[in-house]
């Protein structure tokens, strides 16, 4: 499957995949250096909470998520535990999770794109 939304046209606002030896994640990362803009986009997405939950299911959010390098971003994400990039038997589960959740994030973004971009 080709991901349609590789560029949101919003600087420092992106959809990301992540997997390690314990879990897989799909996230919206809001990485603006200007905290006012970062907060504004986070609040826009968060205002769609019930729609977001309908589309992607249970999710986590953190307005002040600290990356390993110390950078503070805002992140909304879903994760699947019990999978590992080092265990080929869990790869189908990881790919299925990525397809399902990224598709849901893309649909939400496209449906509410004008609202989200209106900052």
Predicted regions and their residues:
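Polyanion-binding interface signature
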Residues: 1-81
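Ampiphathic alpha-helical segments that act as solvent-exposed interaction surfaces
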Residues: 47-55, 82-119
């Amino acid at each position: 499957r080709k991901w349609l939304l590789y560029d949101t046209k919003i600087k420092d606002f992106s959809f990301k995949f992540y997997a390690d030896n314990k879990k897989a994640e799909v996230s919206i990362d809001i990485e603006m250096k200007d905290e006012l803009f970062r907060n504004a986009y986070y609040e826009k997405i968060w205002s769609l909470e019930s729609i977001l939950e309908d589309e992607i299911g249970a999710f986590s959010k953190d307005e002040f998520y600290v990356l390993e390098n110390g950078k503070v971003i805002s992140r909304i994400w879903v994760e699947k535990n019990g999978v590992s990039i080092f265990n080929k038997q869990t790869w189908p589960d990881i790919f299925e999770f990525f397809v399902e959740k990224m598709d849901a994030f893309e649909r939400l973004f496209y449906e509410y794109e004008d609202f989200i971009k209106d900052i």
